[in-house]
């Protein structure tokens, strides 16, 4: 068959580590052993030249992994991929260096794709005209919005003229005018017989533009064929899926993960599992390697301690006796404060996931009172519990004296720990957002404690009211949302910010708590709770909630 792209039994998995030191230990272990995330499993298909293939599926089904494999960004662990010609990936900020300007990124990406310097200079005016981002073309890409990154990435990729074009959600962040321009350019590629992979959650765009479709389902190809048939079947599945409650969805997802061997799995070599003697030998080797690692670690620690003692003798540390005396005098007061805080924290729980319903009764079919997201802190009501089938529910206090019920599967006891960061870290976040989204981002936290009338009177832009959430009054201006409780601003949420997870960790450091599956991160400062929530479609932090303690 005259194909352009061919996948044969392709599997892609990622090794999971709990902490950075595990990567060092992995040097002494068998690479086949450990916990892996299976993004794709045994995927096979062929795409003829000139086809436009839509890739659809739920979040986390492997769409972006598939696009990276086609574009050669990553390599498969098993199976074979055959691409005839060059492939270019268009995704939000894909292949763009945030420290370089737009012009410099054009030159760099062109050279990386094998173009000569003369050819790059020739296409630069076309790329600038298509991207249409004005004076920002000479600014660092890190100052761009998501839409501007998508514009530049799309303009570069289509003007490099690849044989295979992979578009991963790049049209989801632009305005309608730019989207129409992109679709027109894609139709030109279509007429030239180019092969295009179009990844999108917009089924209408997929249906109208594509000739075929691949439905990815928990890392496997559930259906591949005519776009009308595949999209129709996927729509029917979505209709049934969207009618499920959040609790039913969680249960359904767990069942499908087990059935399709998708997600986090423990890997062992088959020969080892089927041979008890071999398994015993592997365990002995593993213990021996652990002893070697332990010996090296102890030697390093001894060396560090020796150096520390040596320099301590050379540079004696002065003791602040006055500070010690004050600490002793205030010990009783601090203990009383800690006891009081502990009693409060015993009733505090944190929500572990996004979109969790708080219901009127202890039942998944009961009326929904509110929706809680990862990082929300809730207070239980007298530790009242109830069981419904296999689910346990606990009674929680809402605002304005309301009482609701939430499944204990989605909450966990919350206690402050030693990972509290400085309040000043919040300024680093707002300073970064200010460069991209304007002055209002930096000033937003200054409105904590203001009444709704004071907020409206002092905020520089009109505030639009939204439906209340968990008893809180919600008002919004663009990317900034305020939550008002008991007529005081208690929460500020920055939305649609598209911040990389690496950048979040660079600014705030190690999180106190996290949901590694959903890529959500929780931080605590002296005065605030900070919840950074991701959108798995874009694999970036999309919102940051700041709550005053």
Curated annotation (Swiss-Prot):
Keyword line: ATP-binding, Cell membrane, Membrane, Nucleotide-binding, Translocase, Transport
Superkingdom to which the source organism belongs: Bacteria
PROSITE patterns in the record: ABC_TRANSPORTER_1, ABC_TRANSPORTER_2, SH3B, TAGH
Note the NCBIfam families from the entry.
PRK13545.1, PRK13546.1
Q: Which GO terms describe its cellular component?
A: plasma membrane
Where in or outside the cell it occurs: the entry states: Cell membrane
**What do we know about how this protein assembles, alone or with others?**
The complex is composed of two ATP-binding proteins (TagH) and two transmembrane proteins (TagG).
Q: Taxonomic lineage of this organism?
A: Bacteria, Bacillati, Bacillota, Bacilli, Bacillales
Q: Which organism is it from?
A: Bacillus cereus (strain ZK / E33L)
Q: What does the UniProt function comment say about this protein?
A: Part of the ABC transporter complex TagGH involved in teichoic acids export. Responsible for energy coupling to the transport system.
Region Unknown: start and end of each range? 244-549
Q: Where is it mostly found?
A: membrane
Which residues belong to any copy of the ABC transporter domain? Answer: 22-243
Instruction: Give one Pfam family.
Output: ABC_tran
Record-given protein name: Teichoic acids export ATP-binding protein TagH
Annotated ranges, domain SH3b: 346-415
Which family would the database say this protein is a member of? Answer: Belongs to the ABC transporter superfamily. Teichoic acids exporter (TC 3.A.1.104.1) family.
Encoding gene, per UniProt annotation: tagH
Q: Where does ATP bind?
A: 57-64
Instruction: Kindly give the membrane topology term recorded for this protein.
Output: Peripheral membrane protein
């Amino acid at each position: 068959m005259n194909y352009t792209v061919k996948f044969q039994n392709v599997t892609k998995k990622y090794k999971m580590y709990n902490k950075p030191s595990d990567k060092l230990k992995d040097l002494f272990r068998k690479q086949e052993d450990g916990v892996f995330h299976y993004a794709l499993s045994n995927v096979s298909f062929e795409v003829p030249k000139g086809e436009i293939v839509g890739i659809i599926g739920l979040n986390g089904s492997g769409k972006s992994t598939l696009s990276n494999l086609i574009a050669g960004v990553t390599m498969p662990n098993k199976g074979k991929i055959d691409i005839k010609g060059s492939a270019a990936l268009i995704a939000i900020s894909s292949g763009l260096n945030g420290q370089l300007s737009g012009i410099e990124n054009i030159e760099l990406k062109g050279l990386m794709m094998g173009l000569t310097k003369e050819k790059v200079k020739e296409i630069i005016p076309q790329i600038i005209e298509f991207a249409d981002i004005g004076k920002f073309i000479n600014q660092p890409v890190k100052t761009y919005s998501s839409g501007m990154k998508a514009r530049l990435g799309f303009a570069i990729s289509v003007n490099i003229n690849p044989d295979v074009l992979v578009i991963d959600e790049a049209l989801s962040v632009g305005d309608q005018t730019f989207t129409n321009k992109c679709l027109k350019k894609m139709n030109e590629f279509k007429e030239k017989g180019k092969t295009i992979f179009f990844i999108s959650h917009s089924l209408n765009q997929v249906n109208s533009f594509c000739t075929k479709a691949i439905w990815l389902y928990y890392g496997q190809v559930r259906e591949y064929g005519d776009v009308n048939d595949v999209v129709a079947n996927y729509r029917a599945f979505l209709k049934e899926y969207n009618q499920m409650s959040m609790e039913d969805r969680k249960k359904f997802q767990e069942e499908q993960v087990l059935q399709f061997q998708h997600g986090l799995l423990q890997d062992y070599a088959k020969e080892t599992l089927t041979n008890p003697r071999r398994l015993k030998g592997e365990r002995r080797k593993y213990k021996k390697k652990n002893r070697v690692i332990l010996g090296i670690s102890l030697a390093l620690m001894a060396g560090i301690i020796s150096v520390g003692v040596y320099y301590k003798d050379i540079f004696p540390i002065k003791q602040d006796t006055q500070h010690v005396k004050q600490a002793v005098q205030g010990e009783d007061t601090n203990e009383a404060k800690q006891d009081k805080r502990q009693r409060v924290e015993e009733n505090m729980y944190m929500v572990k996931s996004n979109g969790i319903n708080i219901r009127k009764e202890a039942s998944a079919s009961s009326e929904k009172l509110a929706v809680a997201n990862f990082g929300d802190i809730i207070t239980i009501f007298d530790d009242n519990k109830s069981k419904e089938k296999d689910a346990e529910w606990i009674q929680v206090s809402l605002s304005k004296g309301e009482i609701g019920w939430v499944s204990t599967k989605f909450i966990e006891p919350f206690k402050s720990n030693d990972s509290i960061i400085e309040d000043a870290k919040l300024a680093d976040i707002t300073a970064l957002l200010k460069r991209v989204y304007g002055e209002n981002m930096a000033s937003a936290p200054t409105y904590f404690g203001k009444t709704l009338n004071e907020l409206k009177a002092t905020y520089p832009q009109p505030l639009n009211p939204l439906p209340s959430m968990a008893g809180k009054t919600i008002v919004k201006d663009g990317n900034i949302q305020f939550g008002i409780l008991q007529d005081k601003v208690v929460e500020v949420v920055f939305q649609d910010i598209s911040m990389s997870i690496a950048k979040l960790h660079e600014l705030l450091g190690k999180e106190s708590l996290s949901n590694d599956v959903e890529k959500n991160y929780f931080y605590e400062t002296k005065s605030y709770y900070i919840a950074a929530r991701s959108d798995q479609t874009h694999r970036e932090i999309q919102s940051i909630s700041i709550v005053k303690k």
